[in-house]
From Swiss-Prot:
Residues 70-215 form the CBM-cenC domain. It comes from the Bacteria. This is Extracellular exo-alpha-L-arabinofuranosidase. Optimum temperature is 55 degrees Celsius. The enzyme is inactivated at temperatures above 45 degrees Celsius. Its EC number is 3.2.1.55. Residues 1-29 form the signal peptide. One of its GO terms (cellular component) is extracellular region. It comes from Streptomyces chartreusis. Keywords: Carbohydrate metabolism, Glycosidase, Hydrolase, Secreted, Signal.
Amino acid sequence: MSRIRWRYGTAATALLVAAGLVPTATAHAEDVTDYSITVDPAAKGAAIDDTMYGVFFEDINRAADGGLYAELVQNRSFEYSTDDNRSYTPLTSWIVDGTGEVVNDAGRLNERNRNYLSLGAGSSVTNAGYNTGIRVEQGKRYDFSVWARAGSASTLTVALKDAAGTLATARQVAVEGGWAKYRATFTATRTSNRGRLAVAANDAAALDMVSLFPRDTYRNQQNGLRKDLAEKIAALHPGFVRFPGGCLVNTGSMEDYSAASGWQRKRSYQWKDTVGPVEERATNANFWGYNQSYGLGYYEYFRFSEDIGAMPLPVVPALVTGCGQNKAVDDEALLKRHIQDTLDLIEFANGPATSKWGKVRAEMGHPRPFRLTHLEVGNEENLPDEFFDRFKQFRAAIEAEYPDITVVSNSGPDDAGTTFDTAWKLNREANVEMVDEHYYNSPNWFLQNNDRYDSYDRGGPKVFLGEYASQGNAWKNGLSEAAFMTGLERNADVVKLASYAPLLANEDYVQWRPDLVWFNNRASWNSANYEVQKLFMNNVGDRVVPSKATTTPDVSGPITGAVGLSTWATGTAYDDVKVTAADGATLLSDDFSGDASKWTHTGAGSWSVQDGQYVQTDAAAENTMVQAGDPSWHDYDLHVKATKKSGKEGFLVAFGVKDTGNYYWWNLGGWNNTQSAVEQAVDGGKGTLLTKAGSIETGRAYDIDVKVRGRQVTLYLDGQEWGGFTDDKPAEPFRQVVTKDARTGDLIVKVVNAQPAEARTAIDLGGARVASTARVTTLAADQDAVNTETDAPVTPATSTFSGVTDRFTYTFPANSVTFLRLKQR
């Protein structure tokens, strides 16, 4: 496809210095670090695909219902249940005045829409919407619809109101006979964030699919998308949209929604449930703790991808559950059905309107194919062998019928470890075209791992970085991600696709942080991370121009810090703690025969000395850290005996503890007791240094030993060496990449300065002939700055810089991402 990324980037800016918005290139600070960048314009770097950067949409944090899907009524079909959330009932978000009950009987609207509301004569029902209520704006129009039936004539009075009174003139709808769809339109007379939709019946009536949509949806489409959110996604100019998940895809039952399955309400995301008339789409529980109406379904995802010029990239379940469930489904008939469903999905997307599933697409309003080229099977499976056995069967069936489709595999939920290594081995041996990697790590990890893909096999499977983020929405997180993205671009011959995750978060329904775009029922705002993604996506270029920069020296000095004990959703007893210096001197010894006065409780949970052990008894509490010792300790051996008493996981044994946000810990039996890892926390964000599969037994005492020497750590479990690592990789704050825009001829010099010092930089363009004035876009802010609904400290500033030659000096502001567009002559 042909897309012009630059138009919303630096090329769109007026060529004027933005006075007061960004530090000028000649600014000097007391704290300045000198760097150099050397560009080789004659060398040919990696080509960058149009689709390199994209977005990943998953219905998490109410991203769909109550978010991108513009429906204003919550629980419009009375289908909420305890399968979705233990607090839910079929009348969640509704209040009945008079008599009314939700019924599941043969009088329903259709077989796949099981519930409806039976409303008594003279009664009414009121919906509260999402967040604080239904948002309406003065002068704007809203479309109401309802499926209803009545044995005798009944008049429905439909009203929009809030605590202060009416929000629009009420409408009346005459209902008589069997199920039929009725419509009305409102024009809001006031603006309110706390609206309610009320439906009153003068005689008995049955109601289902009670709906209210703003007329002003994205592209004015029916069953459409919330305009501001869709426009923010479109403004990124993503090369692809990965959907619908995520953990939604590969968790829950793999059965369908039918009488044969008992109308299974906790299913994996199965695309056929989500197409066709919305009143016939089978509701489902959401892995993240609420309900999915599927009003936003596969057709809408494909349509939105097409509308924004992005490649659709759907993900289908592989019949191996992940996200902590970790179960392989052994049912050959069910596997064959899912494989056929996947073939049918390709037909739905690409088949002619005369084909079975192409006809469904055409009847929904899109006779032309959606041009699907990539499809992913599975998501973050922790059972690589079982997953890959099924993946190969999916791939063989797809290649036999649709050889032009790229079938994407994955490498599990982490950036390293046994599962990751096994998955990659299987993918390489089977000549898989593309492998999806996922990781969520600390900003420090992203600064340390800019070179991650430098050593990947150029002839092996290509990488799809389908999910990544640096565990926060502060500017320091955006800086670290920007630094990492320069490495992604530099390795564009290996990394073909990359998308930040998650995309959207409703601030009143949060299951996961950080997120790219935040919103409530009245507004939406860009995170600092969004501004980074937008800057890169709109200024990609078509080819890497090789360049080099001076770097930070390797880390020196030993690992220093006290020791700690912690738990995560687990009750644990610790005993016989001993810390010994390298020369044999005892630094700490505690058998808890007395009290725990040597320990400082800095986390959650409930600690006490019981029967000569230090016990954490709250099996629901997370990060229950207690610390002991001196933060200046180095070169020591830590021994502790640990016994799991109850709960979901195992032990957390910390070392190198500087404070509550900076430490290492050995996480034994983490991730719902499926694997163990060493994690490093830097300023509160954690990154994984080492992982292995394994679990911890309840009631068994384990001997745990950690040996720290310099920057090398060796770990022993029950006297056997478990693993080790050397933490000597610098968190490089200065990163760069240079690309060329073939259409404009511009060289785009992209520099990240993730430190509180300016970076005075000598830039050598290697003889390239360029115009004397550069167009500049800068993101700069305090490292802890966070964009909110009312304040956006991280906002792009545009300017020009004069004095560009083939060798010039530019001072990059502290804590900044800067793109220089240099016009070649």
